[in-house]
Amino acid sequence: IKSFQSSNILNNNYIIRTVSSKVDLDRFYGKTNTEDVINELIELSQPDPETKTIFLWPEGIIPNINQTEFKEFEFLFNNNFNKNHLLAIGINSYEKNNGKDYFYNTFSVYDHKLDLLHDYKKVKLVPFGEFLPFEKILKRIGLKSLTNNYQSFSSGKSREILSIDIEGFDLEVLPLICYEIIYSGNIFKNSEFDVIINVSEDGWFGDSIGPHQHFAHSVFRSIESGKYLLRSANNGVSAIINPTGKIENKIEFS
């Protein structure tokens, strides 16, 4: 696992530190210890108690837990994180409504005690990867989606800009999860945001050109919006891209 932080200083002296990781997809099948992954990510995040920092971790990087269950691992953060630190991460969430279970691919922002501050539920889902079309019928013949033992994900209601507002610090974030980054034009209906954040799990591409093609779309979204774009990927390319499309910092996967 490697990490880097942006050279971009945000208002009220916050920085964003992006963590780029290479955790095997075996974690989705019970072969990875959750605490070990969290501890490694904390170590690579290198939190400085005096530096106000938003740590950006990839999509689905922590195995076998959901957004609410993450709180149970607060003890791992106690010696490293303090009130100067926020964590933004892609992690699944769960709701129960009228007796029915709903699962979402979610971008979540936590404080240093792992109390949830904000979240965005992914709107554009990947067919067969995140949901199974005609699920009731196709499950009967053995087909299923690749959603880490969940049923199909549900789609969020709408694309939302998250307002991270804490102790005088205000940042308007447009979160895009995984392949939502490939959509041109219609993701910017509301342009009142400061930065785009894209979290992704690119391991599904395997040993192919896929992760590089996926990353290339990030450059175009940055140019289209005229905003900085910060990308944190597992098994993919993580980067900071400025509003002109220049890549200011990048970590290649290998």
Spans of features found by a protein language model:
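Enzyme catalytic cores with a strong preference for nitrogen-chemistry domains
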Residues: 1-254
